[in-house]
């Protein structure tokens, strides 16, 4: 009986893992900072995902310095006709706090506009140790043009955030 339950559990786990990332999708990536990045306190920073230029503005404690380099409150506005939206992130500092969920520390929130209203579409974060992998946020959507708002991680620093769409689809900045 234990063996049967183990086999069933493994089959379910493998099926769930296969459902996460579409296998036959070829991705095209666009750096998020090339689209419309909103929510910044100071527009011109050496790293587009920092809220404050810590080279220019000194006097922060270690904790404050880490916080102003995180992307809390930043979002990317874009439109796409892709049926899949993913994110490929290069982290500078990735918070791994034990008292906060991974989706807050290093995850993304995606909203899609429908009938003039932003609707929640997905929240996801890569597992610890798999931060460099392509994170599929949504899949199996229709190929109509969708306006999207992607909130960046709250408690981590990013060097690069690339939005992945399927090859042949378009992605453009929106206001």
Q: Where are the regions a protein language model picked out?
A:
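N-terminal secretory targeting modules
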Residues: 20-175
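Bacterial Sec-dependent N-terminal signal peptides
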Residues: 1-23
């Amino acid at each position: 009986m234990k063996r049967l339950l183990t086999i069933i559990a493994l089959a379910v786990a493998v099926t769930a893992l296969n459902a996460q990332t579409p296998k036959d999708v070829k991705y095209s990536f666009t750096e998020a900072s090339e689209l419309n990045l909103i929510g910044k306190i100071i527009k011109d920073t050496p790293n587009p995902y920092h809220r404050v230029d810590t080279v220019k503005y000194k006097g922060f404690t270690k904790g404050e310095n880490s916080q102003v380099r995180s992307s809390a409150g930043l979002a990317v506005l874009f439109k796409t006709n892709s049926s899949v939206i993913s994110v490929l992130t290069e982290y500078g500092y990735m918070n791994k706090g034990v008292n906060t969920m991974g989706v807050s520390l290093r995850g993304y929130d995606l909203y899609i506009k429908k009938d003039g209203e932003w609707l929640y579409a997905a929240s996801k974060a890569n597992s610890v140790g798999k931060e460099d992998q392509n994170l599929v946020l949504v899949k199996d959507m229709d190929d109509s043009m969708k306006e999207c708002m992607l909130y960046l991680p709250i408690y981590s620093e990013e060097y690069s955030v690339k939005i992945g769409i399927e090859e042949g689809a378009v992605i453009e900045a929106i206001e």
